[in-house]
Every structure is written in structure tokens, then in C-alpha cells.
């Protein structure tokens, strides 16, 4: 399920909640996969993940779509694409894919995998592009 939001035509984003989490019995805050457009500084399609827990220090998050894998750097409970050059390919993979898997490690050492559906992603992306163009 994809939701899109627009804040005064300046910040627009897609937010998706996971359809599956492993392990499923963790006590954690809200977690989501996001794509954000920042109109004022002309930043578009910025991917990020909020996990609802603090990451292991200096750890990387692995985001996979089909056979494609991307590394995200972490700060507290958020992660962003480590190599901005891969952003266009990541978005292309999201448009063509069915699911995103996000693998991360908490500050306690717990390995966690969240799975997100990409149903409706292309339509939601078009909506935020139109709203924040």
C-alpha cells in the first residue's frame, strides 16, 4: 500500500509500511520506506528508510529488489542511499519490481528484514512528481 503526501507543494513523499517483518515480535516504533521530493532545493526521488529502532553504529542497510542490491548508510533510525549515482536505477527497479526487502541490524545486534509491496508505486511517484514540480 502506497500513500502519497504533499506539504504546501514543497515537500512531497510516498510512504509505504511493510507487509512483512522478520522477526515479527519486535517492539519497535513506526517503520516505513519513503521516496521524497524537495521542491525548493530541486531534490527528487530521494529514497530513505525509517526502521523504528536505532541501527548498529556504522552499519549499512541492504535494500534489494529482485536481483538488484543497494547499500544505504545509517544515522540513528534512518537510512539513505549510500551512492546517489544509483538513485535512478533504484527508482527504475522499484517501478518494475513487486517487492522491496530491507535488511538491517539494530544497535542490539538483532538482524531484521522488512518487506514492502511496490503495488501502486509508479502511480504514487507520478502523483508526487506532479504535486511537487
Q: What residue spans do the PLM features occupy?
A:
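A generic "folded-domain core" signal
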Residues: 1-133
Amino acid at each position: 500500500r502506497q500513500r502519497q503526501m504533499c506539504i504546501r507543494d514543497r515537500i512531497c513523499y510516498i510512504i509505504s509500511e511493510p507487509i512483512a517483518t522478520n522477526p515479527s515480535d519486535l517492539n519497535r516504533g513506526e517503520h516505513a520506506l519513503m521516496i521524497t521530493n524537495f521542491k525548493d532545493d530541486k531534490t527528487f526521488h530521494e529514497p530513505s528508510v525509517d526502521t523504528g529502532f536505532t541501527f548498529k553504529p556504522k552499519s549499512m542497510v541492504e535494500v534489494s529488489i529482485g536481483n538488484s542490491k543497494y547499500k544505504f548508510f545509517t544515522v540513528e533510525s534512518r537510512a539513505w542511499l549510500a551512492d546517489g549515482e544509483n538513485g535512478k536505477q533504484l527508482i527504475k527497479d522499484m517501478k518494475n519490481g513487486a517487492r522491496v526487502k530491507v535488511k538491517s541490524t539494530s544497535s542490539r545486534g538483532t538482524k531484521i528484514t522488512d518487506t514492502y509491496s511496490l503495488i501502486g508505486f509508479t502511480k504514487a511517484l507520478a502523483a508526487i512528481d506532479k504535486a511537487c514540480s
